[in-house]
């Protein structure tokens, strides 16, 4: 596992939870994740859950993605998706507002791998270099991804060659993220 990425993700998650605690006096609250089982759930309200990050349980890799395409996935991506279970976290990188995607549970991890495979299928069909997404943006056609060839974090427009490099590594990207509440 890429320890720098794992440490940077944990540090950002701590910054996010601390900012939430300071603003709201509680652990993060999510309406979107209400009713979805997870080891992260601390308590529930009538229509939302309070969550706390938990250590990832299970095989710490995205080998299903590697097997589906007979490729080696960047070590940073293995770390990103298997360091912890947590809720998605709104954040800002420079001028880019985004939602950092996280795995909520073991079932969610399987779904994420299936979505990553689907993303790669589309890229292969369009003859685009392989990327694996890590965050969404308000414009649903734009995502933040890691280029599987270079390891760079990029902003890309889905289905096109429009790509902008944001950071040289995933650890660097995570270190520069700021919580957005």
From Swiss-Prot:
Subcellular location: Cell inner membrane
Protein name: Protein Syd
Superkingdom of the organism of origin: Bacteria
Family in the record: Belongs to the Syd family.
Annotated signal peptide: none
GO-annotated cellular components: cytoplasmic side of plasma membrane
Entry keyword Cell inner membrane: yes
Organism: Salmonella typhimurium (strain LT2 / SGSC1412 / ATCC 700720)
Membrane topology term: Peripheral membrane protein
Stored InterPro entries: Syd, Syd_sf
Biological role stated in the UniProt entry: Interacts with the SecY protein in vivo. May bind preferentially to an uncomplexed state of SecY, thus functioning either as a chelating agent for excess SecY in the cell or as a regulatory factor that negatively controls the translocase function.
Keywords attached to this entry: Cell inner membrane, Cell membrane, Membrane
Gene responsible for this protein: syd
